[in-house]
Amino acid sequence: MIFENTLAFAQQQDRNDPLAHYSDQFHHPVIDGKEVLYFTGNSLGLQPKTAKEHINQELEDWAKWGVEGHFHAVNPWVSYHEILTPASAELVGANESEVVCMNSLTTNLHLLFVSFYKPTAKRFKIISEAKMFPSDRYLLETQVRHHGLDPDDAIIEISPREGEYLIREEDIIAAVNDNADELALLFFGGVNYFTGQLFDMQRLTKAAHGVGALAGFDLAHAVGNVPMHLHDWDVDFAAWCTYKYLNSSAGNVGGIFVNDRHGNNTKINRFGGWWGHNKERRFLMENSFEPMTGAEGWQISNAPVMGMAILKSSLDIFHEAGIENLRAKSLKLTAYLEFVFNDIVNQFTDIKLEIITPTDPTQRGCQLSIKLVGTNKEFFEALTKAGVIADFREPDVIRLAPTPLYNSFEDVYLLGQTLKVLAQNWRQHG
């Protein structure tokens, strides 16, 4: 497609966009009486307008029923998590038995590591990406120490080659093969939070399985961003949060995937709780833990219904819009941002702003990460003052995520015009 950095072109694309109306289903922040340009769906998604309605329903049922709401609410609380499963399974490409919403992201990963990181004297190493999200690194470090191992010996981090920003997948595969006899687990982010690089999870899973290791993924920046097929890819386990692209509010409930190969085996060691116990016998208050089959068997406590009500409001939208349709728009929208950005940068060659996200659309989601070469955080702060909500990551990267559910081509054009004005001011005043 031939792009144009003009308002008329952007508005025409919005008129042609079959998903454009979904933007009206979200609240857009207004600061000082002006609607801001919001490009941080990769950090915290916008609030669905139906969220309040869903929460109010649960508040009304609580007021009406008290504890009996577990069984008599419009959506009975005892099984509330189950209504989130179909749409969640669609988003990650899983059987419904392989998915459940529960807890929060790093908590869920710790629970999954109990079952799927089982180091032995021979197989104890974990291969992961360098510069992964810090919470994931803390997860790996503390899990390894929990087993009495030294992180320096057990964790192998794959870095970009010198002078590059992205990790080459052939280097990951080479590391897997080089450590074939000692590798217990390959654990990566589906999409790297910093660069926006999308990894080929099917390829990495196949490589890990080829040497007798397991493969797991943190999907925080992948779920709701790119289509996935975890079951078909034979991924062993995965976890995600729901407050980024899934728009469920800050710190809200997470989700997990456990491949049916494992989920159907109730003998797998895990940390148990009563919500993972056989649901037909849960309220008999028996002493012996009998886990359910499927991902539900990893649940610990009963569902946080208020948070799940917000998530339901967003998942309903995803189910209606369709992740494949959203991806099709996302590819075009992010490509337009890339075009607009490069058009402006080419006009201001003395100001070094560089995209470090893959240029290949199949190797990224919607996020573009921009490195402030030779500048500092003041450029980002000026962007914020100009009415753009973006995201800064130390030491020198601005992340922009044109989110297809609620961002428009006109948003991208206006962002470009804002960047142009800032570049002009930066050139004049530094």
From Swiss-Prot:
Keywords: Hydrolase, Pyridine nucleotide biosynthesis, Pyridoxal phosphate. Pyridoxal 5'-phosphate binds at L105, T106, F133, P134, S135, D136, D218, H221, Y243, W274, N302. One of its GO terms (biological process) is anthranilate metabolic process. Coiled coil: none annotated. Pathway: Amino-acid degradation; L-kynurenine degradation; L-alanine and anthranilate from L-kynurenine: step 1/1; Cofactor biosynthesis; NAD(+) biosynthesis; quinolinate from L-kynurenine: step 2/3. It comes from the Bacteria. SUPFAM superfamilies: PLP-dependent transferases. It is an enzyme of class 3 (hydrolase). Catalyzes the cleavage of L-kynurenine (L-Kyn) and L-3-hydroxykynurenine (L-3OHKyn) into anthranilic acid (AA) and 3-hydroxyanthranilic acid (3-OHAA), respectively. Belongs to the kynureninase family. InterPro entries: Kynureninase (IPR010111), PyrdxlP-dep_Trfase (IPR015424), PyrdxlP-dep_Trfase_major (IPR015421), PyrdxlP-dep_Trfase_small (IPR015422). Homodimer. Its EC number is 3.7.1.3. The modification N6-(pyridoxal phosphate)lysine is found at K244. GO terms for cellular component: cytoplasm. It catalyses: L-kynurenine + H2O = anthranilate + L-alanine + H(+); 3-hydroxy-L-kynurenine + H2O = 3-hydroxyanthranilate + L-alanine + H(+). Its cofactor is pyridoxal 5'-phosphate. The keyword NAD does not apply. Pfam families: KYNU_C (PF22580). This is Kynureninase. One of its GO terms (molecular function) is kynureninase activity.
